Every structure is written in structure tokens, then in C-alpha cells.
């Protein structure tokens, strides 16, 4: 609003990516994350393509009212990954891609998390994600380059949500737990 300049979504994503890489926060500019924040739904993004052409798949979001998303923030990274760290985990990332192609983003989230935790050699992250499944989560995985854990639980299973929150706050008191949901189409309507 300050300049009254209207930007297209791909221009906003490009600006965000430039800020991420210039500050050293991200290896790739987090283009996929920026696209994910632009609108509800899940997207498959080619971070090597020009930003305006990089969204390969764009599908509707899972119903926001049906799912609770828990973010377990573990503090700053202890290891700064490189792109080479991820190369050895292509099988897990291919499984994530196949799950997206089958329109199953929760399975994709889990496979992506497995690939990431292996690439980072994050034993604690793997244990924490597995603990989520032991406590009845539907999906869980470490974030793109760590160290946060993303956990998805059916929202009608309130006791499960509370049990998982209690589990992490008891065993990992230094972690911050955020309860949220997927973006809904109503939010997209409000933004327009």
C-alpha cells in the first residue's frame, strides 16, 4: 500500500526468494514455501524454473476444518544443510512426488520429512516425527531444511491433539508448540 504498486503473485514470490537467498536464510530462496503462502492448497514447485512458470501442480487445500496442524519449533538449526545433503535421499523425495501426483499431500508431507531428516542426519527429528505417529497423528515430518516438526491430526480428534501437545511439551520443554490449520478458501476470498 505504501507505493500503491500492485504486484502479481509470481513477483511477490520472486521478491521473497531474493530476500531469503540474500540474507542467507535459504539455499533455494524457499520458492516453494512462498508459493504455498500465496493461496490455499498445495503446490508442486520446480525451484529451478523461472518463478512465473515454476508451479507444476496446484491443487485445492485439504478442508481447514477437518485438520489440526501442530508445529513443534525446536529452535535454531544446529546444522546448516547444503544441497548435496539432499541428493542421497532421492528415493524418499520421489515417494513424496508420487504421493502428490496421487493427490495425497499428507503422505507426501511424511515422505518429504523422512527424506529431509535423513539428509540432515537428524536423529532427534526422526524420533520426534515417529513419536507423532505413536500418538495417532495422521502425518508428520520435519520441515524442509529443519528443524521444525509438522504434525497433522484430524481436528475432531481433540484428545489426540491434546495428547500430542502434552507429549512434546513434557519431553521437549524447550520446544514451542503452535496449533493452527491449513489455509481455507475463505481466507483467499478475503485477500482478493
Task: Show which residues each predicted segment covers.
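Short beta-strand
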Residues: 139-143
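Short hydrophobic/aromatic beta-strand micro-patches
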Residues: 150-154
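ATP-dependent small-molecule kinase catalytic core of the GHMP/sugar-kinase superfamily
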Residues: 11-133, 155-159, 163-192
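DPxDG-like acidic metal-binding loop motif
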Residues: 1-9, 38
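Glycine-rich nucleotide-binding loop
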Residues: 146
Amino acid at each position: 500500500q505504501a507505493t500503491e504498486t500492485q504486484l502479481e503473485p509470481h513477483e511477490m514470490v520472486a521478491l521473497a526468494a531474493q530476500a531469503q537467498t540474500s540474507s542467507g536464510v535459504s539455499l533455494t530462496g524457499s520458492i516453494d514455501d512462498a508459493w504455498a503462502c500465496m493461496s490455499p492448497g498445495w503446490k508442486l514447485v520446480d525451484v529451478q524454473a523461472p518463478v512465473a512458470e515454476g508451479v507444476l501442480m496446484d491443487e485445492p487445500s485439504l478442508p481447514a476444518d477437518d485438520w489440526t496442524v501442530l508445529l513443534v519449533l525446536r529452535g535454531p538449526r544446529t546444522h546448516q544443510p547444503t544441497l548435496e545433503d539432499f541428493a542421497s535421499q532421492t528415493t524418499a523425495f520421489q515417494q513424496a512426488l508420487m504421493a502428490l501426483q496421487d493427490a495425497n499431500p499428507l503422505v507426501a508431507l511424511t515422505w518429504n520429512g523422512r527424506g529431509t531428516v535423513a539428509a540432515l542426519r537428524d536423529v532427534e527429528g526422526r524420533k520426534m516425527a515417529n513419536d507423532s505417529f505413536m500418538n495417532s497423528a495422521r502425518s508428520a515430518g520435519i520441515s524442509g531444511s529443519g528443524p521444525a516438526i509438522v504434525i497433522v491430526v484430524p481436528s475432531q480428534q481433540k484428545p489426540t491433539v491434546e495428547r500430542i501437545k502434552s507429549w512434546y511439551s513434557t519431553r521437549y520443554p524447550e520446544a514451542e508448540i503452535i496449533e493452527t490449520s491449513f489455509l481455507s478458501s475463505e481466507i483467499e476470498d478475503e485477500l482478493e
